[in-house]
Regions:
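Aromatic/histidine-rich interaction motifs
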Residues: 104-131
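Residues at structural and domain junctions
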Residues: 31, 37, 120, 141-142
Length: 163
């Protein structure tokens, strides 16, 4: 195999029935881009990779998300966004998170209580690296559904292990 082809993707997932869009979404918007309040039909986690994004929701009223931060918005939340600078982020949409470790999941449910004030979480270096890699993958072509499912499991594993 020639060296040039080793660095190029060999599989075209665009025609595959398992191809998927909309679960992990990489978005870039210029300063001033506004998204009026809209009800979330799924849970979502927003990971800010670059820039600042003003979030207005019941959980995060008037919260500025900065590079390296992330938040969870639940189903039914009304979410409004405003790019305060050029912004680059990833959104993970899901109804139920993939169940990675049932024991840890039950521990989290038993130990967690709703905070008085919600604050953004800071990405670990592992999640930051994961996000950079997933952005590269999403930029190549139509994502493979099976691969995205695995990456969503990996992402939830990282969140469950480190938060």
């Amino acid at each position: 195999m020639a060296r040039e082809t080793q660095c190029n993707r060999q599989t075209d997932c665009a025609q595959c029935p398992k191809a998927t869009e909309g679960i992990l979404v990489h978005r870039k918007f210029p300063k001033g881009q506004h998204f009026p309040p809209d009800k979330c039909t799924q849970n979502c986690i927003l990971f800010i990779l670059q820039g600042e994004l003003l979030v207005n929701s019941e959980e995060y009223p008037g919260t500025t998300l900065r590079e390296g931060q992330f938040i969870l918005q639940s189903i039914g939340s009304k979410l409004e966004l405003l790019a305060l600078t050029d912004v680059n982020y990833v959104v993970y949409w899901f109804n139920e998170p993939p169940l990675i470790c049932e024991q840890r999941y039950h521990e989290i449910l038993q130990q967690s209580e709703a905070p008085l004030t919600y604050t953004p979480l800071v990405m670990t270096q592992r999640i930051t690296n994961f996000m950079k890699d997933i952005c590269d993958y999403l930029g190549e072509q139509m994502p493979c559904g099976a691969f995205i499912d695995l990456k969503c499991q990996e992402l939830m594993y990282l969140i469950i292990c480190y938060y």
